[in-house]
Amino acid sequence: MLRTIVVFAPIIAALAWVVFNIQKPAREQFNRDFLGKD
C-alpha cells in the first residue's frame, strides 16, 4: 500500500501540474484536438 502511494504520488502530482497549466488558452487547443477528433 505504502509503495503504491510512493509510486503514484509523483505521477498524480505531475498530472495535477499539467492540468493546472492547461487552464490557459492551450486548453481550447487541447479540447479542439481531443474532442474534435471524430
Swiss-Prot record:
Subcellular localization(s) per the UniProt record: Cellular thylakoid membrane
Pfam families per the UniProt record, alphabetical: PsbY
One Gene Ontology cellular component annotation held by this UniProt entry: plasma membrane-derived thylakoid membrane
GTP-binding recorded as keyword: no
Any one GO molecular function term: manganese ion binding
Main localization of the protein described in the UniProt heading: membrane
Membrane topology qualifier: Single-pass membrane protein
Transmembrane segments: 4-22
Record keywords: Membrane, Photosynthesis, Photosystem II, Thylakoid, Transmembrane, Transmembrane helix
Keyword Transferase: no
InterPro entries: PSII_PsbY
Top-rank taxon, per record: Bacteria
Biological process (GO), any one: photosynthesis
General function of this protein: Loosely associated component of the core of photosystem II (PSII), it is not always seen in crystals. PSII is a light-driven water plastoquinone oxidoreductase, using light energy to abstract electrons from H(2)O, generating a proton gradient subsequently used for ATP formation.
Subunit structure, as described in the record: PSII is composed of 1 copy each of membrane proteins PsbA, PsbB, PsbC, PsbD, PsbE, PsbF, PsbH, PsbI, PsbJ, PsbK, PsbL, PsbM, PsbT, PsbX, PsbY, Psb30/Ycf12, peripheral proteins PsbO, CyanoQ (PsbQ), PsbU, PsbV and a large number of cofactors. It forms dimeric complexes.
HAMAP family reported in the protein's UniProt record: PSII_PsbY
Family membership: Belongs to the PsbY family.
Name assigned to this protein: Photosystem II reaction center protein Y
